[in-house]
């Protein structure tokens, strides 16, 4: 039986990060000496790892559910729980099978994929522990609204994303657009643009690799001749409508045959219909009966036109229509048609009528000669016309930030072969922005720098210069729009920082011995001291600190003008989070900081109008203090002895920003405050970095990498800031466990029904050691939320979970809750980000890390 249960929605309402329920005991299952107790067995099966040939298991699963369970089509967000309804009375053990698909790990969005798997395990425990005996199929992330119930058959909700994306299956054009985007990746076509129809005369066969399997010359000549014929045909019609006369002369060179040849006799159907239609539309009489030619048996078809100059009114009308026609069609296409149409028509008709030794001459031979003769001047005119039209069009397009972002993404995707030059250009752009150059030099965008770095043709360089000039002209006009939307102005700089840091990490790990050469010019003019202690790590640490602080200063300065607008748009929760981080800095990360942070977090989330008013008053009174503290920290760190290489003008610029409390950069400040505390503590421990070691470098790299990832990913989004607040809370306070559970009062009765039932878990999935340990810990967290007194794990033949009982005992001894344990798991996942970015293997397994850090 397949049914949707109303109680399945309760696991979605659990606030996992703030749950204060205690952790349960964990042990490995040993069948020897076990008495027949009231326990439940849950078997979690990852259907993506099932063997296709294992038909007996699938048939058993299908028959037990009394329905058609197609495990191959099971979605990632779905979970199917099958309960054993045939248990015997003398046995107290009840079994359940939970079918699901594991979510792929995402190192950037740790919270999303951890909660996705945790929701699935929680649903499995919830259905297995409930007294209901029906089999349930549940979608993670569904709501009880009528819309989702009505469209549950054809609507799929993506749970892992921050935004709920609905894909309707009854609209086939959406699938077609996706297929078009996949096929036209190399053509730089937009996914929303419909695919262009091939010409009717095109007979090219496209191979799976996207290359033409027929002769390239004849293929392109065929397409080009079809285009020219159509343009000439349209030009004839326009001229006829403008009361111009088109005269066609049929010349019969044979002396014995002077009869007129019908225009419908040529073999080309397109040319015949075009000529016949032109003759029918014109009112002029056919002049001339024929001329003799020196070569016998040859026939030709000539095309010419005469303007009607007898009436001045017709002439003026013709001029007006000609002007409108030239305005409606691109100038480059008109130049192309006027220069090539006549020659193309003559050559085509000659080819179709001339016979040599009884065999026709291929049309491609004659067309190739014509094309080669006109290619140079045609391409030159087309380039000039396109650049002029591009200047007019981009004047409107460059004011659209979405278009600019799309252009930059295409530059990154299409020019991977010039990655070195592009990275150098981006680095120069970032350095010029960080050292505070004049605003006139900032007008050249990242697109121009990348285009100039990848162009080698003189004409392409001229085009890029015109493009940059046009962008500089639009800069002043674009300032008004950028003031109203300051959040999007940081997108390019944030992405540049992310790419530069990732490349820097890769190069640093490859060349650790020569990393001293990476020092920036800002620290190159510093006087060398007498003692040289760990030159490579010392210079790298200084470079990372100065770069991070300058990057923070740059973003604080950029957000000054849009402060008022951002403060109105952003909620007060962001300010509360910044106040929390600032209090943590002032207290030095001790127990008092923990108490202040908990108090601030509770007041920030407490309902009621009076609490909100107090919070607003408290935030308004601390705005100036927090801003001054942040600026003083930056100035103090940059004025230390190792960092006195900074220009004195930068200190004045930072001191001139007393009102730098901007909500759009709160996430950057919070992460910066954490980074500054770590750096300052490490500087005190190592006495000016004279004994800098690998651990200090790792912390610096992690802080800078985390800063760039946050700026690039979240980009001042409200929902993302809330998630960032939850993640950063665990990073700032490793022992943070005192928060409250918002939904604790909404627990259903069947949560309490699970008290007293010991649970045995069996995991049927072939994952690696790290994934298996992470899966077991998440199942431990889910079982603790449902008040399971004792959790057993069976099937640990390789001993990967032998340390889990020790971890559970230590967590219970330290007083950890469900929320605190989940925050520790998130902290472990975030520490693995720098290693995964450079392809390194994790230094510690999850259970070893928990034993060392709990």
From Swiss-Prot:
Modified residues (Phosphoserine): 96, 130, 190, 213, 226, 272, 300, 304, 307, 342, 432, 443, 445, 447, 450, 464, 492, 536, 581, 627, 703
Region PKA-RI and PKA-RII subunit binding domain, annotated ranges: 219-232
PTM-bearing positions, type Phosphotyrosine: 303
Subcellular location: Cell projection, Cilium, Flagellum
Region of interest (PKA-RI-alpha subunit binding domain), residue spans: 336-345
Region (Disordered): 184-207, 287-323
Impact when changing residue 429 to H: Found in patients with spermatogenic failure; likely pathogenic
InterPro entries to which the protein is assigned, alphabetical: AKAP_110, AKAP_110_C, RII-bd_1, SPHK1-interactor_AKAP_110
GO molecular-function term, one example from the UniProt record: protein kinase A binding
UniProt record, GO biological process: cell surface receptor protein serine/threonine kinase signaling pathway; establishment of localization in cell; establishment of protein localization; flagellated sperm motility; protein localization; signal transduction; single fertilization; sperm flagellum assembly
A GO term from the CC aspect: sperm end piece
Positions bearing Phosphothreonine: 506
Keyword entries, A-Z: Cell projection, Cilium, Cilium biogenesis/degradation, Disease variant, Flagellum, Phosphoprotein
A Pfam short name: RII_binding_1
Biased segments, Basic and acidic residues type: 288-297, 311-323
Post-translational modification: Phosphorylated by STK33 during sperm flagella assembly.
Keyword Cytoplasm appears in the UniProt entry: no
Record has Phosphoprotein as a keyword: yes
Residue ranges the record assigns to the propeptide: 1-188
Tissue expr: Testis specific; only expressed in round spermatids.
Function: Major structural component of sperm fibrous sheath. Plays a role in sperm motility.
Assembly, per entry: Interacts with PRKAR1A and PRKAR2A. Interacts with ENO4. Interacts with QRICH2.
Disease cited in the entry: Spermatogenic failure. A male infertility disorder caused by spermatogenesis defects that result in non-obstructive azoospermia. The disease is caused by variants affecting the gene represented in this entry.
Entry remark concerning the domains of this protein: RI-alpha binding site, predicted to form an amphipathic helix, could participate in protein-protein interactions with a complementary surface on the R-subunit dimer.
Family: Belongs to the AKAP110 family.
Protein name (Swiss-Prot/TrEMBL): A-kinase anchor protein 4
């Amino acid at each position: 039986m397949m049914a949707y249960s109303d109680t399945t929605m309760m696991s979605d309402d659990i606030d996992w990060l703030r749950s204060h329920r205690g952790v349960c005991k964990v042990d490995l299952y040993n069948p020897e000496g076990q008495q027949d107790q009231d326990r439940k067995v849950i078997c979690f099966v990852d259907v993506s790892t099932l063997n296709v040939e294992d038909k007996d298991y699938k048939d058993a699963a299908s028959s037990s559910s009394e329905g058609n369970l197609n495990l191959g089509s099971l979605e990632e967000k779905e979970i199917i729980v099958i309960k054993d309804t045939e248990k015997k009375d003398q046995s107290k053990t009840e079994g359940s099978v939970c079918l699901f698909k594991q979510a792929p790990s995402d190192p950037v969005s740790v919270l999303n994929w951890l909660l996705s798997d945790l929701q699935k395990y929680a649903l499995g425990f919830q259905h297995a522990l409930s007294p209901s005996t029906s089999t349930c199929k549940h979608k993670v992330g569904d709501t009880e609204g009528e819309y989702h119930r009505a469209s549950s058959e054809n609507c799929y909700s993506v749970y892992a994303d921050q935004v709920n994306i609905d894909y309707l299956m009854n609209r086939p054009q959406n699938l077609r657009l996706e297929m078009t985007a996949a096929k036209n990746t190399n053509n730089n076509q937009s996914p929303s643009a419909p695919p262009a129809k091939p010409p009717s005369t095109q007979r090219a066969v496209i191979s799976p690799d996207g290359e033409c399997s027929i002769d390239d010359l004849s293929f392109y000549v065929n397409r080009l001749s079809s285009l020219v014929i159509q343009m000439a045909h349209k030009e004839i019609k326009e001229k006829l409508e403008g009361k111009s006369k088109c005269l066609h002369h049929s010349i019969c060179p044979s002396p014995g045959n002077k009869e007129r040849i019908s225009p419908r006799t040529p073999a080309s159907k397109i040319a015949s219909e075009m000529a016949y239609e032109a003759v029918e539309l014109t009112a002029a009489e056919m002049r001339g009966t024929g001329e003799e030619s020196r070569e016998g048996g040859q026939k030709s078809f000539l095309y010419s036109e005469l303007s009607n100059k007898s009436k001045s009114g017709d002439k003026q009308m013709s001029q007006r229509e000609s002007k409108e026609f030239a305005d409606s069609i691109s100038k480059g296409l008109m130049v192309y048609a006027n220069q090539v149409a006549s020659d193309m028509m003559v050559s085509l008709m000659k080819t179709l009528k001339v016979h040599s030794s009884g065999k026709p001459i291929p049309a491609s031979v004659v067309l190739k000669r014509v094309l080669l003769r006109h290619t140079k001047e045609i391409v030159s005119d087309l380039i000039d016309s396109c650049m002029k039209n591009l200047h007019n069009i981009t004047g409107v397009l460059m004011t659209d930030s979405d278009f600019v972002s799309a252009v930059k993404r295409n530059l990154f995707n299409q020019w991977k072969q010039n990655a070195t030059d592009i990275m150098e250009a981006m680095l120069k752009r970032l350095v010029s922005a960080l050292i505070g150059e004049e605003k006139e030099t900032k007008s050249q965008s990242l697109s121009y720098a990348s285009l100039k770095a990848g162009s080698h043709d003189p004409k392409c360089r001229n085009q890029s210069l015109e493009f940059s000039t046009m962008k500089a002209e639009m800069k002043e006009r674009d300032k008004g729009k950028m003031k109203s939307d300051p959040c999007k102005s940081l997108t390019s700089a944030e992405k540049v920082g992310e790419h530069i840091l990732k490349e820097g990490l890769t190069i640093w790990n490859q060349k650790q011995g020569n990393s001293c050469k990476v020092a920036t010019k800002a620290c190159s003019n510093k006087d060398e001291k007498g003692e040289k202690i760990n030159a490579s790590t010392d210079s790298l640490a200084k470079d990372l600190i100065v770069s991070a602080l300058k990057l923070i200063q740059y973003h604080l300065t950029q957000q000054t003008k849009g402060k008022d607008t951002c403060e109105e748009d952003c909620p007060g929760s962001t300010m509360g989070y910044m106040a929390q981080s600032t209090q943590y800095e002032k207290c030095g990360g001790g127990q008092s900081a923990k108490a202040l942070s908990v108090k601030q977090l509770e007041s920030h989330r407490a309902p009621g109008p009076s609490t909100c008013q107090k919070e607003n008053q408290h935030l308004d009174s601390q705005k100036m203090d927090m801003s001054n503290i942040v600026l003083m920290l930056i100035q103090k760190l940059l004025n230390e002895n190792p960092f006195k290489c900074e220009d004195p003008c930068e200190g004045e610029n930072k001191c001139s920003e007393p009102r730098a409390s901007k909500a759009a950069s709160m996430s950057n400040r919070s992460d910066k405050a954490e980074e500054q505390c770590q750096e300052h503590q490490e500087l005190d421990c190592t006495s000016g970095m004279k004994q800098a070691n690998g651990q200090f470098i790792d912390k610096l790299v992690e802080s800078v990498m985390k800063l760039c990832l946050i700026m690039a990913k979240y980009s001042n989004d409200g929902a993302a800031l809330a998630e960032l607040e939850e993640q950063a809370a665990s990073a700032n306070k490793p022992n943070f466990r005192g928060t409250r559970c918002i939904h604790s009062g909404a627990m259903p009765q069947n949560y309490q029904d699970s008290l007293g039932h010991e649970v045995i878990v069996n995991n049927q999935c072939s994952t690696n050691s790290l994934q298996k340990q992470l899966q077991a810990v998440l199942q431990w967290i889910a079982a603790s939320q449902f008040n399971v007194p004792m959790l057993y794990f069976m099937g640990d033949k390789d001993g990967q979970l032998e340390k889990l009982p020790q971890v559970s005992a230590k967590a219970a001894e330290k007083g950890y809750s469900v929320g605190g344990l989940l925050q520790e798991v998130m902290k472990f996942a975030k520490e693995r980000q720098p290693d995964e970015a450079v392809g390194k293997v994790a230094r510690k397994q999850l259970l070893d890390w928990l034993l060392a850090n709990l």
